[in-house]
């Protein structure tokens, strides 16, 4: 699992929830590290902040779509929830599996619940 977020506090919450459930997790806080992390880690789940400094989430979504990324993506942002939903819709039309969305700030239990559903339940195409 890969967490892509520029806020260390958010990253720590997701990492703690993931490790609690037995996931191996890596985190990056800079979009310049994104491609290398995808190729090296080969994550099956990505938590992606769509409003980071540098390249925006849509550019990173484009990178994943161009490579037919087979895993699940969780879109998250501190922006308006409509922006998260719009970004998720665009990602779906580009062929990505959106496993859920998170509006910041969120609680650790929300991440735990989402990860449990990703591990056992259906996903959206």
Regions found by a protein language model. Give the residues of each.
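Conserved acidic segment of CheY-like receiver
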Residues: 1-9, 14-18, 46
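Conserved phosphotransfer cores of two-component systems
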Residues: 39-41, 64-70, 93
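C-terminal output helix
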Residues: 82-83, 103-119
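Receiver (REC) domain active-site loop signature in two-component systems and cognate sites
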Residues: 52
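Acidic, metal-coordinating helix/loop segments flanking the phosphotransfer/catalytic sites
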Residues: 27-45
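The C-terminal output helix
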Residues: 96, 115-125
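Alpha4 helix (beta4-alpha4-beta5 surface) of REC/receiver domains from two-component response regulators
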Residues: 59, 79-100
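Acidic catalytic/metal-coordinating carboxylates
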Residues: 29-30, 56-62
